[in-house]
Swiss-Prot record:
<dbReference type="GO" id="GO:0006122">
    <property type="term" value="P:mitochondrial electron transport, ubiquinol to cytochrome c"/>
</dbReference>
<feature type="binding site" description="axial binding residue">
    <location>
        <position position="196"/>
    </location>
    <ligand>
        <name>heme b b566</name>
    </ligand>
</feature>
<feature type="transmembrane region" description="Helical">
    <location>
        <begin position="33"/>
        <end position="53"/>
    </location>
</feature>
<dbReference type="Pfam" id="PF00033">
    <property type="entry name" value="Cytochrome_B"/>
</dbReference>
<keyword id="KW-0249">Electron transport</keyword>
<keyword id="KW-1133">Transmembrane helix</keyword>
<dbReference type="InterPro" id="IPR030689">
    <property type="entry name" value="Cytochrome_b"/>
</dbReference>
<dbReference type="InterPro" id="IPR048260">
    <property type="entry name" value="Cytochrome_b_C_euk/bac"/>
</dbReference>
<keyword id="KW-0812">Transmembrane</keyword>
<feature type="binding site" description="axial binding residue">
    <location>
        <position position="83"/>
    </location>
    <ligand>
        <name>heme b b562</name>
    </ligand>
</feature>
<keyword id="KW-0813">Transport</keyword>
<protein>
    <recommendedName>
        <fullName>Cytochrome b</fullName>
    </recommendedName>
</protein>
<comment type="subunit">
    <text>The cytochrome bc1 complex contains 11 subunits: 3 respiratory subunits (MT-CYB, CYC1 and UQCRFS1), 2 core proteins (UQCRC1 and UQCRC2) and 6 low-molecular weight proteins (UQCRH/QCR6, UQCRB/QCR7, UQCRQ/QCR8, UQCR10/QCR9, UQCR11/QCR10 and a cleavage product of UQCRFS1). This cytochrome bc1 complex then forms a dimer.</text>
</comment>
<comment type="function">
    <text>Component of the ubiquinol-cytochrome c reductase complex (complex III or cytochrome b-c1 complex) that is part of the mitochondrial respiratory chain. The b-c1 complex mediates electron transfer from ubiquinol to cytochrome c. Contributes to the generation of a proton gradient across the mitochondrial membrane that is then used for ATP synthesis.</text>
</comment>
<feature type="transmembrane region" description="Helical">
    <location>
        <begin position="77"/>
        <end position="98"/>
    </location>
</feature>
<keyword id="KW-0349">Heme</keyword>
<feature type="transmembrane region" description="Helical">
    <location>
        <begin position="226"/>
        <end position="246"/>
    </location>
</feature>
Length: 379
């Protein structure tokens, strides 16, 4: 009799995705981040669900409801900090996953890559709205500054901002709709994850060497299930170290002050994982130009596959491209640092140079490096 996991309609899907899936035998720990991201998403949905049971989306009580969760709800503090720091872990895994995609040329799987970009935008929107909900000073002013960027759109900008706000400023209507959207977007992300996986399994995974691995595949279970569980243990360990020892390490002290529309914080800045994009936004003196640069900083990823000039897929055997990749990583770290600094000399010029370098590496230097490497190998 054939095993039920190979015949039952539901079990068959799970079997073909997580058990009998033919997987390249040489994929490294950099391929662990997909499963870690799925874990983070599930964790965020579950902790968020419990937080939503106690949260009130009213400007007068939102801040107090967070205090109530931390002080009066059983294990409310740990749920709240797991959710807040879980978001940070989510973005660490997300950026590592994307970095691996660029380094090993996984972006040549166009459908998977493009769905990944849509997923990234969905998760960024979710995280931004979640940051507004505690209704602290940085929540309020962050929401005001970022939603105000829509006013840079010619002709319809002002109307659009007021439509998003549900009034003439960030207020109760804004908070309520942000809660609704913050609740629903992760489920959209979950659906997109399924599509992402569907497209990936149409072609099969890439591997570090970037060459076709059809001749050397092994079943996903038990080899990669064990490997993923190890990654999972490390992720949970780091998350719990953060939650239990320094839960506010990655947060902003200003968010422990209730939102006050009459008092602007000295430095308005988003969460650390958006600082690189915020630095790019601020590096352009023109409002519309800044908004376009902000959008392009993410959307530029969509044209990376079109700019692949090398005859090799992966950067494993391409030293010039490797140097450029690590320069890009260093540049993004610099942008993240600049995004958290005040707008004054020398930070302004450093931010502008780092922003130019970011786009130059992706759009100019990497394609040229690919062509140089081809000519070195006489291809």
């Amino acid at each position: 009799m054939t095993n039920i996991r190979k015949t039952h309609p539901l079990a068959k899907i799970i079997n073909n995705t997580f058990i009998d899936l033919p997987t390249p035998s040489n994929i490294s720990a950099w391929w662990n981040f997909g499963s870690l991201l799925a874990t983070c998403l599930i964790l965020q949905i579950l902790t968020g669900l419990f937080l939503a049971m106690h949260y009130t989306s009213d400007t007068t009580t939102a801040f107090s409801s967070i205090t109530h969760i931390c002080r009066d709800v059983n294990y409310g503090w740990i749920i709240r900090y797991m959710h807040a720091n879980g978001a940070s872990m989510f973005f660490i895994c997300l950026y590592a996953h994307m970095g691996r995609g660029i380094y090993y040329g996984s972006y040549t799987l166009a459908e998977t890559w493009n769905i990944g970009i849509v997923l990234l935008l969905t998760i960024m929107a979710t995280a931004f709205m979640g940051y507004v909900l505690p209704w602290g000073q940085m929540s309020f002013w962050g929401a005001t500054v970022i939603t105000n960027l829509l006013s840079a759109i010619p002709y319809v900008g002002t109307d659009l901002v007021e439509w998003v706000w549900g009034g003439f400023s960030v207020d109760k209507a804004t908070l309520t709709r942000f809660l609704a959207l913050h609740f629903v977007l992760p489920f959209m992300a979950l659906a997109l994850t399924a599509v992402h996986l569907l497209f990936l399994h149409e072609t099969g995974s890439n591997n570090p060497s970037g060459i076709l691995s059809d001749s050397d595949k092994i079943p996903f279970h038990p080899y990669y299930t064990i490997k993923d569980i190890l990654g999972l243990i490390i992720l949970i360990l780091i998350l719990m170290l953060l939650v239990l020892f320094s839960p506010d390490l990655l947060g902003d002290p200003d968010n422990y002050t209730p939102a006050n529309p009459l008092s602007t914080p000295p430095h308005i800045k988003p969460e650390w994982y958006f600082l690189f994009a915020y630095a790019i936004l601020r590096s352009i003196p023109n409002k519309l130009g800044g908004v376009l640069a902000l959008l392009l900083s993410i959307l530029v990823l969509a044209i990376v596959p079109s700019l692949h000039t090398s005859k090799q897929r992966s950067m494993m055997f391409r030293p010039i491209s490797q140097c450029l990749f690590w320069l890009l990583v260093a540049d993004l770290i610099t942008l993240t640092w600049i995004g958290g600094q005040p707008v004054e000399h020398p930070f302004i010029i450093i931010g502008q140079l780092a922003s130019i370098l970011y786009f130059m590496i992706l759009l100019v230097f990497m394609p040229i490096a690919g062509m140089i490497e081809n000519s070195i190998l006489k291809w």
